[in-house]
Amino acid sequence: MSGPTWLPPKQPEPARAPQGRALPRGASGPPLAHGAALQPHPRVNFCPLPSEQCYQTPGEPEDRGLAWVGCHGAPQHSQGLPPDRGGLRPGSLDAEIDSLTSMLAELDGGRGHAPRRPDRQAYEPPEPPAYRSGSGPLRPNGGALPPPPLPGSPYGAPTPASYATASTPAGPAFPVQVKVARPVRGCGPPRRGASQASGPSPGPHFPLPGRGEVWGAGYRSHREPGPGVKEEAPGVSGPAGARGGGYGPQVPLSQPPEEELERLTKKLVHDMNHPPSGEYFGRCGGCGEDVVGDGAGVVALDRVFHVGCFVCSTCRAQLRGQHFYAVERRAYCESCYVATLEKCSTCSQPILDRILRAMGKAYHPGCFTCVVCHRGLDGIPFTVDATSQIHCIEDFHRKFAPRCSVCGGAIMPEPGQEETVRIVALDRSFHIGCYKCEECGLLLSSEGECQGCYPLDGHILCKTCSAWRIQELSATVTTDC
């Protein structure tokens, strides 16, 4: 933080120049209220402390001089004579203020943002004068103004507008960005002469001891304006956010129009302005109008309908007191509902209850039966023949399975089995239990050599019976010869 903001000097009357005194090196003391330029001492220079700020104490008149805030915040008044009011020249000061205001308005207007008021300026402090030791009277230095120092701290001290002169810089030496901050607590409206300036990238600001609180971009003290501080006129200043800052005007966000919300709002207003005259039951689910009066409506499908609006969706027949069918929140009379249903592939009647689908067709559960035993096949395995006739497994095997050449019965799978096992010999089919020797009844096997089949003259014989018959035939042939 740089040194304090010094008030610009003015030319006082020589006869009323205050008497000064020598100050020790490093001591804090204010400049004279009316800017008597002090001659620099060759050995002793005045070095102001960085914590000093110059402002006018609350409740004091303007002619009491300037108030200084020391390191501990206690106001300290400078020793000197009251300011001379004869050298202020109010006419020239007002003209100069108006000229500076118009110049700032033109400059800011060309940059595309709102013009800044004189109270928003951060004045560059002139070089602090040096005190001369001794008890002699202090005389103003007739030389030129000292060169401006480096840019000061962004925490500019409040400066009364009546002290602005032609030698005051028109603007700060560094670029100023006036930001519109959020509403500040504990701070009143901006005063004329108070500077609110922020550097290009200011760091975080914290309250300092003996000073006001730092809020947002500038410095502002918690004090009421004194007699010498002029309040801004209404309409010139406003709360934070009311005027555009260096970042352009703030435009409130506008929500896009919602037609549904607007329609519901208008409907609500219309209903409030036009209440129903009779007994109100609700809004009709068909036409959308109010259902008013006893006996004027019916309740169905969790909605209220006019009697004339509750009709079949297909034939438009009134359904009051009738049985109706609800499909996807639509009402149908019985005949129209039945016409929309699937028909059974066996009896060709509409299926009103459960639908059993098989082979891409719809059936009543009672119509899906075996064509042989007429047993219902709902949940039971079935099969079809070449003509698409439905059979249960047992009847299908009985009807189409091969027959045994011994017993004549159908050769079917064993209980719990799915495959059929049979023995084929001499182009005939046999059950496993029916494959026996025709002479002795020995159970034959297709695997064993001793119990294998030895057919003779179309007969199924075992090995022993086959050999005995061969010998018998041989003996007969020999005898005949």
Swiss-Prot record:
Biased composition (Pro residues): 1-12
Positions bearing Asymmetric dimethylarginine: R25
Residue ranges, annotated region (Disordered): 1-259
Quaternary context: Specifically interacts with the ligand binding domain of the thyroid receptor (TR) in the presence of thyroid hormone. Interacts (via the third LIM domain and C-terminus) with PTPN13 (via the second PDZ domain). Interacts (via the second LIM domain or via the third LIM domain plus C-terminus) with PDLIM4 (via PDZ domain). Found in a complex with PTPN13 and PDLIM4. Interacts with SVIL isoform 2. Interacts with LPAR2 but not other LPA receptors. Interacts with PRKAA2. Interacts with MAGI1. Interacts with SCRIB.
Location of the LIM zinc-binding domain: 284-321, 344-403, 404-472
Record's compositionally biased regions (Low complexity): 153-173, 183-193
Key word ATP-binding present: no
Cited CDD domains: LIM1_TRIP6, LIM3_Zyxin_like
Organism: Bos taurus
Protein name stated in the entry: Thyroid receptor-interacting protein 6
Residues found modified as Phosphotyrosine: Y55
